[in-house]
């Protein structure tokens, strides 16, 4: 029987409202400032250029549908770091931008960790507040209920990096608001990922090992 794997481009809106499962063989979120800033700068350069109708393509996200506790989830075989960064970016950006462009107040998807279930709701705690002495916009670290967990430190640090990047040059908020949530067929600039959904009858961990051996 033929294996009907799916490979296509998906824009950011097509990633939303899905449930992503991060299995035990994946390491935690570990993007440093440099990696987060590289993504932000690359997107802003694309948004600023004369590229109407073109798209910025992120690296692949590889998933496989699995059943967990009688629910359908998408097990993330490759692309966890990108998927997590996009979610953190949306949590920060939507608080800065949504009222200005008539977009829904929040864009989101669910990420569940096999080995760290207690921090599943951490992304919903990312909140912008004002520093009393300077009135500067900052990430409210008092909302972090998991300060001793290494994953939470990286997630909150990424949120702070993203917020500071937007506040350093606020026109970036406008540019992201114009293009970040565009669909594939919008006719304007959009952000897309290479989406690969495998239906192979194999352990996803084996697929993960095979893919990483080729990198």
Give the label of every model feature segment.
Residues 1-215:
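Glycine- and hydrophobic-rich flexible loops that cap the catalytic core of alpha/beta enzyme folds
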């Amino acid at each position: 029987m033929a294996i009907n794997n799916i490979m296509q481009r998906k824009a950011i809106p097509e990633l939303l409202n899905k449930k992503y499962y991060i299995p035990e063989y994946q390491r935690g979120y570990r993007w440093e400032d440099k990696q987060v800033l590289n993504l932000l700068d690359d997107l802003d350069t694309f948004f600023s250029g004369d590229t109407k109708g073109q798209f910025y393509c992120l690296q692949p996200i590889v998933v496989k549908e699995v059943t967990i506790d009688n629910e359908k989830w998408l097990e993330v075989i490759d692309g966890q770091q990108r998927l997590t960064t996009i979610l953190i970016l949306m949590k920060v950006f939507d608080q800065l931008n949504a009222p200005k462009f008539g977009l829904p107040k929040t864009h989101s998807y669910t990420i569940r960790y096999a080995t760290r279930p207690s921090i599943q709701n951490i992304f919903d705690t990312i909140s912008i507040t004002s520093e009393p002495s300077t009135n500067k916009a900052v990430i409210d670290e008092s909302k972090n209920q998991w300060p001793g967990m290494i994953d939470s430190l990286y997630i909150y640090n990424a949120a702070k990096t993203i917020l500071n990047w937007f506040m350093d040059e606020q026109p970036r908020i406008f540019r992201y608001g114009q293009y970040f949530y565009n669909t594939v067929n919008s006719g304007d600039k959009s952000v897309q990922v290479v989406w690969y959904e495998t239906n192979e009858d194999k352990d996803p961990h084996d697929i993960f090992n095979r893919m990483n051996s080729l990198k």
